[in-house]
């Protein structure tokens, strides 16, 4: 039974990857719709550079990034995450999980929201004639089960809805993940296919691509130091993810100032390689790892959002997490641009602890 399930799971994961390949030719901004589904679902992930698929504990928010992270430790967990995004945009995620022992599955349901607030409505002369509202929502359900003692499989199905004044659009997407977790060596490896799917309806009857993303991640908790180091590779379905601007010259790979170039083939290849990577680390301190310090670096964000000749911390992130009584509280900050960054707050608890 388990052998057959593993074969079906691997075949399904492969089908998702190859089905989505033709529609994922570009990741440049403006090329895909429902981009809000790519945002970090939690304060912890925000602090870790915006990507983390290789952790398996009781943090339910990880299931939004990798459904294979679902496990019995999340039974009865409720999480609420709110992101104070740029320009007063409000973004958040709320979810609940339940383990079903008879089936061997852990299920979860979640709601992601993005509220852009009121936007000025103007006529062809630029005269403001009113206000319009814009928002996006995604409903997610998913489940996971172990295939072996170390390998688990998970699947999410997501319905996305978008509203701009009287215009509406919808999309159906799926995530599939496999995770290998060796508890003895504290090593985890994972592969995830995210947002494979298509639009169901659009604003103007023109169907556009969803933000498909193939990710591979590894994490290792050190033996003699309470520290977990992770490397997450993203957008692996496309090698070249550089945005070449001939007006800019790149003098290096990791410099604090800005950025982008269409020259210097050797440096460009190295730079492009690192744009696929997110590096992060997490200190696990105190009894039961109740206090955590997190740092992250997202090279793609650094290179795309830095301003030439100005030093900034774009691409860097950090945060803390603490357990107080029955609650897990997380705070994350990510520097996006000289104009500012985002603050992410998360609260999680186990409902069964109150009854």
Residue ranges, per PLM feature:
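N-terminal secretory signal peptides that target proteins for export/translocation
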Residues: 1-5
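Bacterial N-terminal signal peptides
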Residues: 9-19
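Short alpha-helical "patches" and their helix-cap loops
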Residues: 8-11, 335-337
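Subset of outer-membrane beta-barrel
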Residues: 26-355
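Sec/Tat signal peptide C-region and signal peptidase I cleavage site
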Residues: 19-25
């Amino acid at each position: 039974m388990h052998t057959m399930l593993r074969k079906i799971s691997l075949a399904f994961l492969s089908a998702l990857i190859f089905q989505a390949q033709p529609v994922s030719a570009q990741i440049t901004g403006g090329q895909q719709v429902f981009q809000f589904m790519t945002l970090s679902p939690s304060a912890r992930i925000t602090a870790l550079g915006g990507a983390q698929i290789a952790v398996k504990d009781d943090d339910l928010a990880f299931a939004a990034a990798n459904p294979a992270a679902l496990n019995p430790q999340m039974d009865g967990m409720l999480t609420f995450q709110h992101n104070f995004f740029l320009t007063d945009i409000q973004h958040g995620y709320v979810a609940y999980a339940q383990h079903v022992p008879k089936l061997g599955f852990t299920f979860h349901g979640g709601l992601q929201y993005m509220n852009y607030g009121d936007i000025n409505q103007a006529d062809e002369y630029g005269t403001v004639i009113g206000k319009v509202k814009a928002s996006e929502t995604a409903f997610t359900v998913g489940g996971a089960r172990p295939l072996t003692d170390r390998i688990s499989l998970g699947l999410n199905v997501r319905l996305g809805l978008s509203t701009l004044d009287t215009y509406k659009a919808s999309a159906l997407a799926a995530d599939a993940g496999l995770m290998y977790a060796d508890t003895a060596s504290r090593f985890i490896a994972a592969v995830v296919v995210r947002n494979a799917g298509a639009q169901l309806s659009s604003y103007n009857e023109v169907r556009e691509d969803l933000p498909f993303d193939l990710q591979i991640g590894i994490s290792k908790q050190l033996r003699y130091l309470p520290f977990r180091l992770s490397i997450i590779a993203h957008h692996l379905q496309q090698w070249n993810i550089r945005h070449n601007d001939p007006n800019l010259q790149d003098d290096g790979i990791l410099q604090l100032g800005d950025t982008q170039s269409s020259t210097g083939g050797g440096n460009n290849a190295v730079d492009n390689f690192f744009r696929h990577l997110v590096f992060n680390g997490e200190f696990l301190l105190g009894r039961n790892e109740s206090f955590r310090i997190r740092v992250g670096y997202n090279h793609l964000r650094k290179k795309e959002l830095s301003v030439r000749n100005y030093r900034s911390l774009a691409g860097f992130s950090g945060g803390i997490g603490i357990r107080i009584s029955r609650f897990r509280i997380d705070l994350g900050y990510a520097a996006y641009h000289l104009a500012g960054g985002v603050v992410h707050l998360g609260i999680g608890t186990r409902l069964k602890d109150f009854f």
